[in-house]
């Protein structure tokens, strides 16, 4: 079933794709109107924006962050072309001096991010932008667009792969994706999340990842009979011979004809290495069990039995519970669209401001009637605490950027909303990792992304730091994201200050 192979060189085709598709105007109009407002009323402020999300996708307990490489490429290639300026001028909104500024625009700020493939949780910054206010404002929309999409698909893929319990998941969703880019980059994210490969040839070319595929019902129907179709395909692809057996009747026609072809291959001395059948409809549990019996009786008990047909993590988990004899899964629509959770929900919020004549950032906070939507102020970082014996995540701690954690010190963690919920972590029992790393400094890339297959391997290790209770699909155990005492005090003081002003 593996038609393509992984290339040996680091792929730069993705960067060429991003350059060929100028994404500078991939922004909401109000980012540009605000930029003109800042331009006309200059403050020379440097600001900090945090990109984070509030609710885990698909009812789970975690997410997988993805899309960082494309975000970096977007930042590197920010440039308003003459055509861009001409179009903006035609809107009759922007003045000539502002358009002149845009014609020479470059991003000069710093960006920190959590590496792709990392397990992440609500309210912790996935991306932190530190830049002049006009620059930080412009990049909001594209950062959200890129990170939200790929993180959603990577998370869905991680769930699907977990349900498969080690079986290969093939990403088959291109034809159902919401457009070419969703198909290309969704497949990339799906592989980061754990898929073995994709049917999308362009994704394979751009990212040097395995491309996978069998054949369609139309192949069978174009021949006089099913056997001839199978035999012809087997001659063409003897080392990747997976036969689709449900065009007419799985058990009466498809499997018997597949067995006949396999027997003939064996008699002709053709090695049966990567071979098997695919079932795309019907009762997959029953049909796979019966097909396995037939294959085993003919001496082909090692044949791969692949299934497709609107699969997702819930159906795969159910089929596993029914002891379905399936060991390879083609997952399309419900993966590439994350159909039960169509949006990731990431947001981009101002956290701090520094005036031109100041050396310190002033923390900012956004209020809400919903307590969980009140933002965390200031210049922050994120630490992850691991249990030293098990390697499992104990908690994440959002701190102010100047705070350092000492793993030898005792620590009291508390819930930032229900502050009476506390736990003590003894020094020497945990390890600490800072999650945010610099990826852009003064507008230049300082981070080289691993290959997609390396990110996939990293993501598997990341997921192994979760307890199984946090990976189950129904009522998963929450992983706690706490605030340091210093950050919590700052947040409380700002809330009290705003509350007092409201009473004046």
What are the functions of these language-model segments?
Residues 13-46, 54-57, 93-94, 99-121, ...:
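Buried, small/hydrophobic-residue-enriched core segments of structured protein domains
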Residues 6, 115, 121-122, 432-434:
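Residue-level recognition of short, solvent-exposed, well-ordered loop/turn junctions
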Residues 212, 277, 305, 327-329:
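Hydrophobic residues within beta-strands of alpha/beta enzymes
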Residues 6, 272, 324:
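Structured loop/turn residues at beta-strand edges in well-structured enzyme cores
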Residues 86-87, 155-159, 173, 471-477:
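Short coil/turn segments at secondary-structure boundaries
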Residues 1-14:
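Single conserved hydrophobic/aromatic residue that forms the stacking wall/gate
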Residues 43, 47-103:
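N-terminal, Lys/Arg-enriched amphipathic/low-complexity engagement segments
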Residues 13-45, 49, 58-60, 65, ...:
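Gly/Ser/Thr/Ala-enriched C-terminal appendages of enzymes
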């Amino acid at each position: 079933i593996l038609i393509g192979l992984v290339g040996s060189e680091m792929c730069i085709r993705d960067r060429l794709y991003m350059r060929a598709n100028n994404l500078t105007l991939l922004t909401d109009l109000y980012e540009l109107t605000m930029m003109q407002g800042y331009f006309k009323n200059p403050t020379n402020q440097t600001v900090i924006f945090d990109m984070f999300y509030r609710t885990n996708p698909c009812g789970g307990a975690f997410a997988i962050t993805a899309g960082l490489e494309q975000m970096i490429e977007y930042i590197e290639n920010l440039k308003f072309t003459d055509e861009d300026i001409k179009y903006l001028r035609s809107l009759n909104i922007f003045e000539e001096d502002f358009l002149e500024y845009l014609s020479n625009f470059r991003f000069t700020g710093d960006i920190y991010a959590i590496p792709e493939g990392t397990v992440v949780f609500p309210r912790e910054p996935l991306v932190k932008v530190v830049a002049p206010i006009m620059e930080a404002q412009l990049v909001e929309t594209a950062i959200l667009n890129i990170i939200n999409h790929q993180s959603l698909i990577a998370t869905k893929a991680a769930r699907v792969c977990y349900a498969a319990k080690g079986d290969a998941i093939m990403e088959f969703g291109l034809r159902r994706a919401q457009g070419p880019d969703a198909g290309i980059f969704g497949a990339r994210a799906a592989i980061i999340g754990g898929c073995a490969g994709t049917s999308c040839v362009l994704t394979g070319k751009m990212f040097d990842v395995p491309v996978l595929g069998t054949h369609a019902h139309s192949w069978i129907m174009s021949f006089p009979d099913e056997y001839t179709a199978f035999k012809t395909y087997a001659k063409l692809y003897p080392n990747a011979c997976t036969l689709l057996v449900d065009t007419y009747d799985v058990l009466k026609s498809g499997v018997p004809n597949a067995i006949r072809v396999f027997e003939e291959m064996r008699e002709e001395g053709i090695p049966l290495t990567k071979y098997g059948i695919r079932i795309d409809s019907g009762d997959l549990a029953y049909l796979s069990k019966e097909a396995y019996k037939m294959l085993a009786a003919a001496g082909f008990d090692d044949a791969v039995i692949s299934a497709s047909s609107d699969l997702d993590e819930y159906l795969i988990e159910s089929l596993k519970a029914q002891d379905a004899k399936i060991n390879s899964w083609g997952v399309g629509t419900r993966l590439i669209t994350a159909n039960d959770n169509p949006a990731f929900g990431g947001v981009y919020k101002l956290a701090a401001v520094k005036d031109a004549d100041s050396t310190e950032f002033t923390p900012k906070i956004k209020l809400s009637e919903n307590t969980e939507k009140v933002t965390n102020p200031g210049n922050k970082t994120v630490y992850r605490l691991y249990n030293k014996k098990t390697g499992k995540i104990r908690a994440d701690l959002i701190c102010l950027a100047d705070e350092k954690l000492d793993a030898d010190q005792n620590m009291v963690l508390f819930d930032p909303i229900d502050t009476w919920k506390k736990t003590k972590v003894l020094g020497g029992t945990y390890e600490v990792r800072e999650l945010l790393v610099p990826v852009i400094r003064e507008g230049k890339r300082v981070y080289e992304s691993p290959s997609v297959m390396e990110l996939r391997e990293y993501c598997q290790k990341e997921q192994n730091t979760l307890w199984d209770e946090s990976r189950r699909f129904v009522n998963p155990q929450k992983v706690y994201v706490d605030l340091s005492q210093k950050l919590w005090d700052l947040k409380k003081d700002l809330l009290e200050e705003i509350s007092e002003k409201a009473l004046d």
